[in-house]
Swiss-Prot record:
It catalyses: (4R,5S)-dethiobiotin + (sulfur carrier)-SH + 2 reduced [2Fe-2S]-[ferredoxin] + 2 S-adenosyl-L-methionine = (sulfur carrier)-H + biotin + 2 5'-deoxyadenosine + 2 L-methionine + 2 oxidized [2Fe-2S]-[ferredoxin]. This is Biotin synthase. HAMAP family: BioB. Binds 1 [4Fe-4S] cluster. The cluster is coordinated with 3 cysteines and an exchangeable S-adenosyl-L-methionine. [4Fe-4S] cluster binds at C67, C71, C74. The keyword Chloroplast does not apply. Gene3D superfamilies: Aldolase class I (3.20.20.70). It comes from the Bacteria. Catalyzes the conversion of dethiobiotin (DTB) to biotin by the insertion of a sulfur atom into dethiobiotin via a radical-based mechanism. Keywords: 2Fe-2S, 4Fe-4S, Biotin biosynthesis, Iron, Iron-sulfur, Metal-binding, S-adenosyl-L-methionine, Transferase. GO terms for biological process: biotin biosynthetic process. CDD domains: Radical_SAM.
Length: 331
């Protein structure tokens, strides 16, 4: 049998064809002593098909906690005994957060809400926030507001939402182990409506929730079929009070193999470091990931957990001579 990295070099690097599910599984099964070789190839693929620029994004929680869904990783579910309580952010606070995000050089600011889907109150707050931000801050605006109806998709598009995030979270075959209050297919339907409305699709998930390597490869194949503009990769940071609160953190070598494997499966997709990378990878792992396929980062804090200081990520990019993607390059 041909060596999978030799196959990937010819197929992905030279021809630009992503690995299929079986090939991705072979990459995930590589021994640790081939990790450096794997990361180097993933970096070559990223540079060849995406270029050196790194997109920087900040996120803010407009509505925190009190969500009716039972996503087992999430401390914002109202169904679990987690310490997170429901709270809303006002429009001036949204504008200030957007300003601080823009100061980092970020081109993307994502407004997030812990909901099954937006109601009229939330949509009105989002509309007011977007209008206020546009009047004061030069930055692209994304949203992550759960599952949408066709009317809501059209309204968000009319507001000028640049990109919409809705994560599939995990492989289709593993989804019912993670969420039971809605289906994988419902999420998929929202993503299709978003694309048809002309917004960029952002869709990723969380690694380390108990899925097998085969299901991790399946997830990469699911995403390749969806073909989103961006894939955020999160790593489970077990939250107290949630059903996944006692799971072990993913080993760093396993997480880095996944980063590289997803790059080889999705050679032209924006692959973003998201939540959990600090506890899973640490500072060294963050550097290895950016030199192993990653070409976008979330700076600052996440929704309910602390991230690396923005300055640390920006300094790392500077040290690695990775230019931050300019706003005019995204328009």
């Amino acid at each position: 049998m041909s060596d999978i990295l030799a196959v990937a070099r010819e197929q992905v690097l030279e021809r630009g064809v992503g690995l299929d599910q079986d090939q991705t599984l072979q990459v995930l099964q590589l021994p640790d002593d081939r990790l450096d070789e794997l990361l180097a190839l993933a970096h070559e693929v990223r540079m060849a098909h995406c270029g050196p620029d790194v997109e920087v994004e900040g996120i803010i929680s407009l509505k925190t906690g009190g969500c009716p869904e039972d996503c087992h990783f999430c401390s914002q579910s109202g169904l679990f005994a987690s310490p997170v309580r429901s709270a809303w952010l006002d429009v001036p606070s949204l504008v200030e957060a957007a300003k601080q995000t823009a100061k980092t050089g970020a081109t993307e600011f994502c407004i997030v809400a812990a909901v099954r889907g937006p109601d009229e109150r939330l949509l009105a707050q989002v509309a007011a926030g977007i209008e206020a931000i546009r009047n004061e801050v030069d930055i692209q605006i994304a949203c992550s507001l759960g599952m949408l109806t066709q009317d809501q998709v059209e309204r968000l598009s009319a507001m000028g939402v640049h990109r919409y995030n809705h994560n599939l979270e995990t492989a289709r075959s593993f989804f019912t182990n993670v969420v039971t209050t809605h289906s994988w297919e419902e999420r998929w339907e929202t993503l299709q409506m978003v694309r048809e409305a002309g917004m960029e699709v952002c869709c990723g998930g969380i690694l380390g929730m108990g899925e097998s390597l085969g299901q991790r490869a399946e997830f990469a194949a699911n995403l390749a079929e969806l073909d989103p503009h961006e894939v955020p990769l999160n790593f489970l940071n077990p939250r107290p009070g949630t059903p996944f609160g006692d799971l072990e953190v993913l080993p760093a070598t396993e997480a880095l193999k996944a980063v590289a494997a997803f790059r080889l499966a999705l050679p032209r997709t924006m692959l973003r470091f998201a939540g959990g990378r600090e506890i899973t990878l640490g500072d060294l792992g963050a550097k290895q990931g950016i030199l192993g396929g990653i070409n976008a980062v979330i700076v600052g804090n996440y929704l309910t957990t602390l991230g690396r200081p923005a300055e640390a990520d920006l300094q790392l990019l500077d040290d690695l001579q990775m230019p931050i993607k300019a706003l005019n390059a995204t328009l």
